Amino acid sequence: MYILARVDRSILLNTVLLFAFFSATVWVNNNYIYHLYDYMGSAKKTVDFGLYPYLMVLALICALLCGGAIRRPGDLLVTLLVVILVPHSLVLNGANQYSPDAQPWAGVPLAIAFGILIIGIVNKIRFHPLGALQRENQGRRMLVLLSVLNIVVLVFIFFKSAGYFSFDFAGQYARRALAREVFAAGSANGYLSSIGTQAFFPVLFAWGVYRRQWFYLVLGIVNALVLWGAFGQKYPFVVLFLIYGLMVYFRRFGQVRVSWVVCALLMLLLLGALEHEVFGYSFLNDYFLRRAFIVPSTLLGAVDQFVSQFGSNYYRDTLLGALLGQGRTEPLSFRLGTEIFNNPDMNANVNFFAIAYMQLGYVGVMAESMLVGGSVVLMNFLFSRYGAFMAIPVALLFTTKILEQSLLTVMLGSGVFLMLLFLALISFPLKMSLGKTL
């Protein structure tokens, strides 16, 4: 084990690109996107003399945390946190009607910066590889078992939702409302459907792409279709797209340059602006960039207001609160929708840093960030030491979940803990101690 801290030309290039990306985020928000969500509280970002020096320093810190390329699971997680979470939390902070005076050195922006810094530093720990690669036969047997369990759960979901199952685009929100009753959060149906699909299919699909095995490819697509028909979820299709591109690229080159990821997102921002200028409306802005950057930045402003009004929640909405005799209250995401947006049916999903801040302030953020950091170390260890390539899609699954859910929900309800356990089982040489004994 060793710690890598290296600065080269790629870091300088990424600093420039991240600065351009952050600056473009402010420009696009103020001129093209914020008005698409102003009915919920989004606003223009205040631009003053100190903004651009701040963005340059922020870009340098983010470039140092990301490094030059995505080579390991932890690199993927940190890079996605930087290019998705930083823009709406530390660049567009204050671009809302709930906390217009929010600064990066206070409140939820500071909590998020603190958490990303912890995870980014932990990710600098490196491990020397061993001669033996991942146990192929052991891994294949586990994948077959997962695929069988996944198919059983898909059949279960289909029959439970048969009364309203549909691929109709207009009825997606109605299906979501019905699914909340049929597959209620915290119920056996809810846990089974969530873990049996959303935890399994990214790994199965990734294996199919990487090994060119059509069965797992088709199974991943079937999962996305079932989740769309039963739950009205578009998220699985985005995950399939990301996994396919990532696995194909990794299969060919073995790494992804961070500069290319930043350039791709920068081009999306500019394409959205160009589409608006040419057609007077941008589908890209409305259906992708608004959801990726403007909606979460507005919700984080609401988080700051919530904490200032109600203080810390002390995990009263979790099983921990029930075990401590406090009683289990309404989930924070729904309480945020009720108290700040006056909509009791609104599930105001925010990232796990923000949830931890609402639960226990900076102490909660530090504790949960260390848990995520520990998971990063485990995935990096298995990947570097034992060649556990499946840690890459697990890291992608982990990241996409913590961007909009609490850590406890991600680990247990979304099955990430189970996938980490599965990853360890197919990676560690389980028969080593038995062989030595004999």
Curated annotation (Swiss-Prot):
Molecular-function annotations in GO: glycosyltransferase activity; O antigen polymerase activity
UniProt catalytic activity: n lipid-linked O-antigen repeat units = a lipid-linked O antigen + (n-1) polyisoprenyl diphosphate
Consequence the record notes for mutating residue 186 to V: Does not affect B-band LPS biosynthesis
Annotated metabolic or biological route of this protein: Bacterial outer membrane biogenesis; LPS O-antigen biosynthesis
Loss of function: phenotype: Knockout mutants express B-band LPS containing complete core plus one 0-repeat unit. Mutants are still producing A-band LPS.
GO cellular component entries: Gram-negative-bacterium-type cell wall; membrane; periplasmic side of plasma membrane; plasma membrane
Result of changing residue 275 to A: Does not affect B-band LPS biosynthesis
Result of altering residue 291 to A/K: Abolishes B-band LPS biosynthesis
Outcome reported for the amino acid change (mutating residue 180 to K): Does not affect B-band LPS biosynthesis
Record localization: Cell inner membrane
Protein name, as recorded: O-antigen polymerase
Organism lineage: Bacteria, Pseudomonadati, Pseudomonadota, Gammaproteobacteria, Pseudomonadales
Gene coding for it: wzy
